[in-house]
Amino acid sequence: MNLHEYQAKSLFAEYGLPVSEGFACDTAQEAVEAAGHIGGNLWVVKCQVHAGGRGKAGGVKVTGDKEEIRAFAEHWLGKNLVTYQTDEKGQPVAKILVESCTDIANELYLGAVVDRATRRVVFMASTEGGVEIEKVAEETPELIHTAIIDPLTGPQGYQARDLGFKLGLNPTQMKQFTKIFMGLATMFVDHDFALLEINPLVITTEGNLHCLDGKIGIDGNALYRQPKIKGMHDPSQDDAREAHAAKFELNYVALDGNVGCMVNGAGLAMGTMDIVNLHGGKPANFLDVGGGATKERVAEAFKIILSDSNVKAVLVNIFGGIVRCDMIAEGIIGAVKEVGVKVPVVVRLEGTNAELGREVLAKSGLDIIAATSLTDAAEQVVKAAEGK
């Protein structure tokens, strides 16, 4: 689960981090009033969406005219913002963040992730702020400095100072950076973050550090113990198909291929996607129907997969461990009849009553291709997707 910038900054403020005074507004009038409340003669207005690249897409504006703030809000509220990180439809804009303008002397980067290799929270800092950190990592990795947090001792001041020296901070800035580092590290663990970024962390013209932007990703598996964070969820930013799948306890992730995949078990689902790729196909999705693959859930899974117009064939790969394959076969037949599937469907069944399940499919009279193995299934579905 991701948070909006204004939500991230509200958490930053709770931990004593320096952020701009700002207000998230639902209407153009609120945006104008927010500028008046903030005061000054220069403001920044930003579309609030779960995507980067807002500035290049016209979703960020610096202005000293309140009527321009009104016009900006009227233009974007209720519309979708398309950036390089969204699909062609973009993300809906429901709030506009109005902030005081900050005079910038230099831009830095500070972020943290859960690193699976070290099984630790790893902080990253760089002098290359304000740009895509992925690009920096690829082209000039030596400019990214790291600090690994030991879960037994927690964040240490010396780690902050080490990063601060590498960023070229002066003694005053070093103290500020240490406070920011320690606050972020504590916040990361307190709220079960999976990702955290301040890009840019700026040095103002007065020489102070300031959190100009904020990006936070939460570990969805921990939301049960984070009621406050869970309450910040904005469903409008979710993929519609993924949100619909979640209602039926289906794990669905949209991809950009043309082979729909329906599998029971996350590991088997990933293996299925790999073998489709191996045989020249491109998966259109990851979809795990779980252990209890009932007719109703299979039907919903088909509906979700086929809602993607790019899908040209569907591969159903089921291992009958918890459930019997003949029962799954009945569910697939019922789902195909109910949904009215118009694309080729390849089914591979293994496990309990697998042979019986294949017989049920063969006698159904439907255009369902029963595969004899996973390799056969992958080859057949790739050919079907290509129209062969």
UniProtKB/Swiss-Prot annotation:
Q: Which cofactor is recorded for it?
A: Mg(2+)
User: Which sites bind Mg(2+)?
Assistant: 199, 213
Decide whether keyword ATP-binding is in the record. yes
Q: Name one GO molecular function term.
A: succinate-CoA ligase (GDP-forming) activity
* Entry keywords, A to Z: ATP-binding, Ligase, Magnesium, Metal-binding, Nucleotide-binding, Tricarboxylic acid cycle
* EC numbers on record: 6.2.1.5
SUPFAM superfamilies documented for this protein: Glutathione synthetase ATP-binding domain-like, Succinyl-CoA synthetase domains
Pathway of action: Carbohydrate metabolism; tricarboxylic acid cycle; succinate from succinyl-CoA (ligase route): step 1/1
Write one Pfam family the protein is assigned to: ATP-grasp_2
Cofactor: how and how many bound: Binds 1 Mg(2+) ion per subunit.
> What positions does the entry give for ATP binding?
46, 53-55, 99, 102, 107
Domain ATP-grasp residues, every copy: 9-244
What is any one GO biological process for this UniProt entry?
A: succinyl-CoA metabolic process
- Write out the residues that bind substrate: 264, 321-323
Reaction catalysis annotation = succinate + ATP + CoA = succinyl-CoA + ADP + phosphate; GTP + succinate + CoA = succinyl-CoA + GDP + phosphate
GO CC, sorted alphabetically, is: cytosol; succinate-CoA ligase complex
**HAMAP family registered for this protein in UniProt:** Succ_CoA_beta
Q: What does this protein do?
A: Succinyl-CoA synthetase functions in the citric acid cycle (TCA), coupling the hydrolysis of succinyl-CoA to the synthesis of either ATP or GTP and thus represents the only step of substrate-level phosphorylation in the TCA. The beta subunit provides nucleotide specificity of the enzyme and binds the substrate succinate, while the binding sites for coenzyme A and phosphate are found in the alpha subunit.
Which protein family is named in the record?
Belongs to the succinate/malate CoA ligase beta subunit family.
Q: How does it assemble?
A: Heterotetramer of two alpha and two beta subunits.
Designated name of the protein: Succinate--CoA ligase [ADP-forming] subunit beta
The organism named in the record is Shewanella baltica (strain OS155 / ATCC BAA-1091)
